[in-house]
Amino acid sequence: AALTSMAIGFAVTGLWWLLVTVPLIKNYKQINYVEKKEHAVRSAFRRIFETIRFIATKDKKVFFFLIAFFLYIDGVGTIIDNCINIGTDLNLSTVGQVICLLATQVVAFGGSLVFAKLSKKYDTVQLILVCIAGYFIVCLYALTLKNLIGFSFLAFGVGCFQGSIQSLSRSYFSKIIPPDNSGEYFGLYDIFSKGASFLG
């Protein structure tokens, strides 16, 4: 029964992301891009290293943001990963945990929409700080958990800021980088994101 529930959970999550990705695939158009070159791999690595050197020496705003992003996104990943461990420590049923985690994805989507609207009125950096503060409160709340109801509130809290902090970070990063070099810059962004998960 537990394996069936998990399989259903994965299937529903996959279907959910497929549905929300369709509008992007249908409507997205690449505006800034680099012309294809003969030695694509070698050229890509050369441009990446040139971008790293440029950011480290001349683009301090991007440099310091990437360092900050590396630190706080590692904390976000740790919190999300440990939700399962908390549920296990509380001896919650697998079904209950899966339902909460699925609900987290739905809440995360709604949270992203809310913060997207707020970003039109407030500074993006301030909203990122709000998300970080929200995660700090979620961590403190996690220390008081005793049952499934409490775990549900924890999942809701994580969901409120999960999609928001990721989308806000990406949005802010896109504003401070040169559009013509977005490929290299976002390549570094993803390296810092995945590197935080690996080292964390």
Where are these regions (language model features)?
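Structural signature of the two symmetry-related core transmembrane helices
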Residues: 126-141
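Helix-to-loop junctions at the C-terminal end of transmembrane segments
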Residues: 110-124
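Short amphipathic helix-loop junctions that connect adjacent transmembrane helices
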Residues: 81-97
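Loop-to-transmembrane helix entry/capping segments in MFS-fold secondary transporters
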Residues: 94-95, 179-189
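Intracellular juxtamembrane helix-capping segments at the cytosolic ends
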Residues: 164-177
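Juxtamembrane intracellular "pre-TM" segments in multi-pass secondary transporters
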Residues: 31-66
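C-terminal membrane-cytosol helix-exit motif in multi-pass small-molecule transporters
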Residues: 14-33
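Helix-loop junctions at membrane interfaces in 12-TM secondary transporters
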Residues: 143-155
